[in-house]
């Protein structure tokens, strides 16, 4: 992030017609298509006659970087009848604490969980939400400065209240995630990954009577086959591809062709860069 924001590096790369970008949810190009999920889900509920046009629907979203759920906020601002957006966290529950108290504290114990895409302590897209709620570049800049210097910041009570009008929250432990994977498969025949299981568990606690709740499934279970196998009570293989095959055999579900094909692909990128060298490596690129 420091390299992205370094104007000197940007200027030097611009001389070579190079511009740095990121493929994660910091990139607006990642957020825009995610907005479509919410409209598509609402349309499916209408088609199935589960709701009438105009009925509000809640969404529970597993998230660490606050990108996918922010897309839901944009869908709401665009006019989709969204009730609450429930932020589902794993044991790295910094967002749950913030949405409950208004204080964001990144200086805390970090947990490596079975839902690694949510193992985040500094949630990048929350900055965007804070801008929309406060309407103040200066105030948000102050929050980010405090976060960088002290590891925390606190929003005003009225800001927290405004956020809580749209957002709910909850978190799941590792044991609860494993239990949810097993329960959903045994009770519903639905095979979910670890991240989706986080949201299922939180959704069950946060669902309001009479309001439909949509859980956003954010990954294939075959992307995390060892964790899913263990949750279902099977011995996990150390090799992900063997675990993928074992999961297919145990559940009679088929892995996505794109994932299964990776075993036969040639590895194209193997460079591991020390964080201290990122700027130098970026400047070494040629157009």
List the predicted regions and their residue ranges:
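PLP-dependent amino-acid enzyme catalytic core
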Residues: 1-287
